[in-house]
Design a protein with these regions (language model features):
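Active-site acidic-Proline motif in GNAT/NAT acetyltransferases
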Residues: 87-89, 93, 121-122
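Conserved active-site alpha-helix within GNAT-family acetyltransferase domains
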Residues: 97, 121-140
Length: 157
């Protein structure tokens, strides 16, 4: 039977291991700069995001990292899904769907007006899954990002 649990500070190394596995799957391993100290600060000291695990027989088989954003149009918080990942040996068993549904329940219980996330355009299995749960791609929007160096440069200009 699948269970879910909220991550605790003692899980930092496990969270980081999942982050590395996801980054490897997404072919973005060279972009990971998170460390245990950084995760402790942002996840547990500042509480900027949350992590839940999906578990089988007390073994963490996957994780999701999420946080709240805000919609000025609805006047309510939303749930932003940063990461969702299931270990390869546990895929095709419904664990990812169960983990996603648990996030939907959290969003509903907290009164969120929406859930949002991004998905790599080559990740067809994930895109197909999201479409199957009636998620819609956002048309007419482009995602922008300032990385740390750009933030620093602009802040100091």
């Amino acid at each position: 039977m699948l269970k879910f649990r909220q991550a605790e500070e003692k899980d930092i190394e496990l969270i980081l291991a999942f982050i590395y596995e996801l980054a490897e799957y997404e072919k973005m391993l060279d972009e990971v700069s998170a460390t245990p100290a950084i995760l402790k600060e942002w996840l547990f000291d500042k509480k900027a995001a949350e992590v839940i695990f999906v578990m089988e027989d007390d073994i963490e088989t996957g994780y999701a990292l999420f946080f709240h954003n805000f919609s000025t149009f609805t006047g309510k918080a939303g749930l932003y899904l940063e990461d969702i990942y299931v270990k390869p040996t546990y895929r095709k068993k419904g664990y990812g769907k169960a983990l996603f549904k648990e996030l939907v329940k959290i969003a509903y219980q907290r009164g969120c007006s929406r859930m949002e996330w991004v998905c790599l355009d080559w990740n067809k299995p994930s895109i197909d899954f999201y479409l199957s749960v009636k998620a819609k791609p956002i048309k007419d929007w482009t995602i922008f990002r300032l990385d740390h160096e750009e933030i620093k440069d602009l802040a100091n200009s």
